[in-house]
Amino acid sequence: MSSNELQHLTDAVAHQMSLVFGEGANLDPATPAGLHRRYSFMFHYRIRLPDGIIKSIIVKIPRDAWMKTLHEAISSDHIRGIITTEFEILNAIADAVEGEPLLCAIRPLAILPEFNAVVMDNVQMRLLKTSLSRFSPTWVNSEDWKQFEGPLELAGKLLRVIHSRFATTQQESLESLRVLENPAESLDALGRHDRSSNALLHPLIDLYESVKSVRVPLAGLHNDYHLGNVFVTPEGKVGTLDPNWTASGCVYVDLACIISYPQTRRVQVLTQGLRFPSSLREPYETALLRGYFTGAQFSYPVLYFYCATAALEKWLYIEDLLRELPRAGSWAASRWVRHYFHGLIRQYLEQGLKASASNRQLDDREHLAPLSCS
């Protein structure tokens, strides 16, 4: 990033903040601290408000993974659309959580369209994924779990509030949503290089056949709702970051993303499932589902179908990353990853089929409970 680009950005931030906070609001003259993430450029500024209080803000400029320079990000029409949507969605989420004492949201202060940037408060927070490091593979401290369980349940509640805010009146069957096409094609493609992947296709189809007539609610989706994008403040309030927004989709997509996260994050894959204790899997799911459904009926077979497809998507994502390694290393790592995901996806499919066989789902004629904030 050139010094001229940074200065132009700083000038724009200073001007916008004087409009937001009034004349006399001044940026700290020190150069802003930059933090470059895989999908964003971020800059930390400090503002002295007219009353003398120092306020910390973040300027975020999204980028695609291939974008190496700030110029590429700020000149992209694609990124301009993303930042406009994010600004609107974050404001709508902030409106939705008002009145919820244990939920919070980061309301954007301003948008800088000429820089494809959004300006936000720098909120003190801890990402929920950091809590996973507290749990030993062989022993779980009950106090550590209790401190994690409360925010986890609130994460489920927050997702419900978001879905309720962006719910549609539609309910569609899984068959009409054509949810089998992509995972079936993915398994077929994987099977060309590894025949054992074909063994997952039949149970996937069997589970799909058992749930294809179940009708599910549609809503706007966060589409990246996992413990790395859910935070807790020092006051114990829970909020979310970085929506990868989809205007309408099955709510189980977001649920499966966060439920499968401890099982599909890279450190768990590399340790072949040892990092997240298997004893925590059921209470982890239960806390999230309790927060989201608050006692309402839902379909376990549908949930596990989506968990299986979420795990499959993560498998494909990691395989793409491995292709960047030297060929010998890529081949060995791919076998390691394949072994892990075979087992995980099979578990989800078997759980779904078992739940289906025991009627642990809604009758085909029933709908899921309407989306409404409790």
How should each PLM-predicted stretch be described?
Residues 228-258:
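Catalytic activation segment of kinase domains across protein kinase-like and atypical kinase folds
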Residues 252-296, 310-327:
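Active-site activation/catalytic loop segments of kinase-like enzymes and analogous catalytic loops
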Residues 115-127:
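Conserved short submotifs of the Hanks-type protein kinase catalytic core
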Residues 1-114, 233-238, 361, 365-374:
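Conserved NTP-binding catalytic cores of kinases and kinase-like/nucleotidyltransferase enzymes
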